[in-house]
């Protein structure tokens, strides 16, 4: 067990669980993705944490913790989400080991096992888009969040190495998300390749996902519940 894991309590207080349930996260996913609560007891020893994050660790208190797993199942970073009103709404902490790993939210050991077994992979942005679509799709698919509307070389290498099924990209419905998904022409008139084409270039089957009813999958669920979610993604499910 590393320092970061020791700093997370996986026994969520009621306000943490209530917050996650209100965002549409099922109890099954709360356990599977190992949502936790900041409970730091010892001082960090990791050089990256000491150099970059030590002064902000107290801001993690009172926030729900979203572990960021390596493909081997080790927690290499966290996202800390505020329950209400605090800014910024999310904080991130990465350990030295995170530098050598693809960083996704949603990549639990159980999700990794399903990817190896041939599950389709959906790529979204944030953690609540992960949990919302995982709720809809069930265990035949794994939903991973890149935490911003882009993929890194490490993301692409991971997908090429592990995915046997199809890939679907369902980024946010804003300009940034759609441009990143489909590609765009930049201010200098140069063509910029989108995430769908980058993944297709790996030799994988990759499709863009178009939906209506909200700026992202979680907003659709918040606006209309499971029925609205099912309707929005009926072409793909």
Predicted regions and their residues:
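Phosphate-handling DNA/RNA-contact segment within nucleic-acid enzymes
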Residues: 39-166, 181
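RNase H-like polynucleotidyl transferase catalytic core
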Residues: 143-149, 204-214
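Short, surface-exposed amphipathic charged segments that create phosphate/polyanion-binding patches used
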Residues: 47, 157-163, 216-230
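C-terminal or mid-to-C-terminal helical accessory/interaction module adjacent to the motor/catalytic core
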Residues: 208, 228-237
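Acidic beta-strand-to-loop metal/phosphate-binding motif
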Residues: 123, 165-185, 209-210
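TOPRIM metal-binding catalytic domain and adjacent DNA-binding surface shared by DnaG-type primases
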Residues: 1-65, 69-72, 112-116, 200, ...
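Short, aromatic/basic amphipathic alpha-helical patches
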Residues: 179-202
